[in-house]
Amino acid sequence: MKLIVKVFPEITIKSRPVRTRFIRQLAKNIRAVLRDLDPAVVVNGVWDNLELETRITEPKALKDMTERLSCMPGIAHFLQVDEYPLGDFDDITEKCKQHYGQSLEGKIFSVRCKRAGKHTFSSMDVEKYVGSKLRRECGAAGISLKAPQIEVRMEIRDQRLFVIHSQHDSIGGYPLGALEQTLVLMSGGFDSTVAAYQIMRRGLMSHFCFFNLGGRAHELGVMEVAHFIWKKYGSSQRVLFVSVPFEEVLGEILGKVDNSHMGVVLKRMMLRAASRIADQLQIDALVTGEAISQVSSQTLPNLSLIDCVTEKLVLRPLIASHKQDIIDLAEEIGTADFAKHMPEYCGVISVNPKTHAKRNRVEYEEQQFDMAILERALENAKLVPIDRVIDELGQDVQIEEVSEALAGQIVVDIRHPDAAEDEPLEIAGIDVQTLPFYALNARFKELDNSRQYLLYCDKGVMSRLHAHHLLSEGYANVRVYRPS
């Protein structure tokens, strides 16, 4: 299969050195993301696109390849094509007929040709000749440039002809690794996950920082969604997941700070800690999911007070977004189900919070706070490569993996319902039940405790995370199912 990858249009207006660097980075990212599917994948760069060739033919692998490229920053869209040496107009018509001939009968169609290089003919010459001949020879109902039922598409580059089968859109932006890095403050809710996506989509490599207010279950949930976002949109780069134990910080705020100022003080403590971590990682910008006046701490006066504790640039991709738009985008990118079942602690600690806090009052409240507690939280922060979060769950719980389900055991398919429906898990003689990952922890207690349950997902990431949590909660009848 051959693909022509069209780069993000804003890349094409850069200077020659910058453009070359960005396209080389994109080619490197594509190879990294597709390496496990096809170690021999070939990616070659030209001035405004990349050409990708793979010898794999297995439909599932090709589908995976398409999905990964559709989620890669730096790509505007890509075309699946067949390549031929450029012949005369009759030869071009014949090649188009091979691919489109049967589908044109009784249809209204158009011919679209893009051309680069020096030729004795124009793109319109090709379109007129090929369109006229296909209409006569394929029994088409007619030609319409404005409202065709089928578009016969091709590209001509120098002495090469590309007949286009399909086009797949991607997410645009710049290639990860070509721009600077950021540190995203993650709570796992709608806002922070969408903010992380927006910043990664633009091309900024993003590490994840989680302030743990809610115990191990909350940490595992944020690990899960952070890993999902990275795997889907940023796996060409290795980034870190940073977990900062903030329960003691929160306790100090609850005990020492006036109730009306707790939210602002908590956010200021988070920004102080995040800035220190960013210094350690040589990162110049922080990212949050805040939007104007969505909650009391997010009014303009309060945001200004929060920002003044750091010299870092604080990026807020969602600052002017409506909540429903954020939720809709979370549904689109796949983080909504995580967010719906993620506890949100930052917004529940204040009663009658100040929407226009005064700097001198906030600083007075913080004088009551023992800063040694914040230092202790930073000392105990854990920095783990995002692709190793599963390995870092700790040795406190042994997670058993099995490659074969035995009679009497129940395999629980915890994949997203769409994935379970597209590729149902069927095992001869074994009871397979579907229970989506986002509902598993809440509903597992309803299952028969006398049975053995094997958790299954495609890559084993979510199944291990949830097995760890359930085992930690005292359920001894849980294993991970990893068929060979």
Swiss-Prot record:
Active site: 457
Transmembrane annotation, as ranges: none
GO biological process, one term: tRNA 4-thiouridine biosynthesis
Domain THUMP: 63-167
Residue span(s) of domain Rhodanese: 405-483
Major location category of this protein: cytoplasm
Top-level division of the source organism's lineage: Bacteria
Gene Ontology terms: cellular component: cytosol
Cysteine disulfide partners in this protein: 346-457
CDD domains: PPase_ThiI, THUMP_ThiI
Location within or outside the cell: Cytoplasm
Reactions catalysed: [ThiI sulfur-carrier protein]-S-sulfanyl-L-cysteine + a uridine in tRNA + 2 reduced [2Fe-2S]-[ferredoxin] + ATP + H(+) = [ThiI sulfur-carrier protein]-L-cysteine + a 4-thiouridine in tRNA + 2 oxidized [2Fe-2S]-[ferredoxin] + AMP + diphosphate; [ThiS sulfur-carrier protein]-C-terminal Gly-Gly-AMP + S-sulfanyl-L-cysteinyl-[cysteine desulfurase] + AH2 = [ThiS sulfur-carrier protein]-C-terminal-Gly-aminoethanethioate + L-cysteinyl-[cysteine desulfurase] + A + AMP + 2 H(+)
Gene Ontology MF terms: ATP binding; CCA tRNA nucleotidyltransferase activity; tRNA binding; tRNA-uracil-4 sulfurtransferase activity
Entry EC number(s): 2.8.1.4
A Pfam short name: Rhodanese
Binding-site residues, ATP: 185-186, 267, 289, 298
InterPro entries for the chain: Rhodanese-like_dom, Rhodanese-like_dom_sf, Rossmann-like_a/b/a_fold, ThiI_AANH, ThiI_fer, ThiI_N, THII_Thiazole_biosynth_dom, THUMP_dom
Pathway the protein acts in: Cofactor biosynthesis; thiamine diphosphate biosynthesis
Swiss-Prot/TrEMBL keywords: ATP-binding, Cytoplasm, Disulfide bond, Nucleotide-binding, Redox-active center, RNA-binding, Thiamine biosynthesis, Transferase, tRNA-binding
Job description of the protein: Catalyzes the ATP-dependent transfer of a sulfur to tRNA to produce 4-thiouridine in position 8 of tRNAs, which functions as a near-UV photosensor. Also catalyzes the transfer of sulfur to the sulfur carrier protein ThiS, forming ThiS-thiocarboxylate. This is a step in the synthesis of thiazole, in the thiamine biosynthesis pathway. The sulfur is donated as persulfide by IscS.
Annotated family: Belongs to the ThiI family.
Name of the protein this chain belongs to: tRNA sulfurtransferase
Gene name tied to this protein: thiI
